[in-house]
Curated annotation (Swiss-Prot):
GO terms for cellular component: cytosolic large ribosomal subunit. It comes from Serratia proteamaculans (strain 568). Gene3D superfamilies: Ribosomal protein L30, ferredoxin-like fold domain. The keyword Transcription regulation does not apply. CDD domains: Ribosomal_L30. Keywords: Ribonucleoprotein, Ribosomal protein. The keyword Ribonucleoprotein applies. GO terms for molecular function: structural constituent of ribosome. This is Large ribosomal subunit protein uL30. InterPro entries: Ribo_uL30_ferredoxin-like_sf, Ribosomal_uL30_bac-type, Ribosomal_uL30_CS, Ribosomal_uL30_ferredoxin-like.
Length: 59
């Protein structure tokens, strides 16, 4: 079984760059407080790093 991380959106996407909004949707995050589990891959880590100011990550 692959290692997973929990990603939680902590800030609103209103007024953010369109690229950052698209990244949140790509991660499956829709609203503040929404948490999703994703595989810990380099692609997912890159997406999380791009929007790190809007999300919280748990190993």
């Amino acid at each position: 079984m692959a290692k997973t991380i929990k990603v939680t959106q902590t800030k609103s996407s209103i007024g953010r760059l369109p690229k950052h909004k698209a990244t949140l949707l790509g991660l499956g995050l829709r609203r503040i407080g929404h948490t999703v589990e994703r595989e810990d891959t380099p692609a997912v880590r890159g997406m999380v790093n791009l929007v790190s100011y809007m999300v919280k990550v748990e190993e």
